[in-house]
Amino acid sequence: MIDLTKLQNIVDSTNINLKELDVLNFLKNRKRWPLRYPWGQPSVEILSNAGDTQSNYLFDADSYLNFNKWEELYNLGYTSIVSNILDLTDDLRILQKKLFNKTGLNISGNFYFSKPGQQASFDAHKHSYDVIVKQIYGESTWSINNKSFLLQSQKSCIVPKNSVHQVLDKNVKKLSLTINIE
């Protein structure tokens, strides 16, 4: 059985210093962001105010991200989900290696990247797997199983599988790293 507290300690002890400009620069590398990865997962999505994700209109005819289209929505305050990101920096690669060594699982990670203006998160939902969230910068108010708390910069939380959760607000620019343990 996987000890989530030990994994959270690994996440907490791994320094990940990223700023908004870093993520913007990652997204300008358009060939890194296909419409879908070979396994079918979208690389970049926008969370709509209807509570679902949209991605097709963010991509050019060659199926790679159009940064300008994406940036327009980001600047309006829409949350972006940037998937499969644990290879982007040395710190993220180190974190992935540490988590793999502890679990034997190919751990995946996503960024939730946003600024104030639109819906903060998916409506309350749950996953069939555990998630560890690290707030890289900014802060947001979370609810996990009807308990609300403020997740601050460089802090983390565990979202146990089948827990009803959501981000309730985002009043500042924020970058969250979600680590899916599945």
Regions found by a protein language model. Name each.
Residues 44-155, 163-182:
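Active-site region of the double-stranded beta-helix
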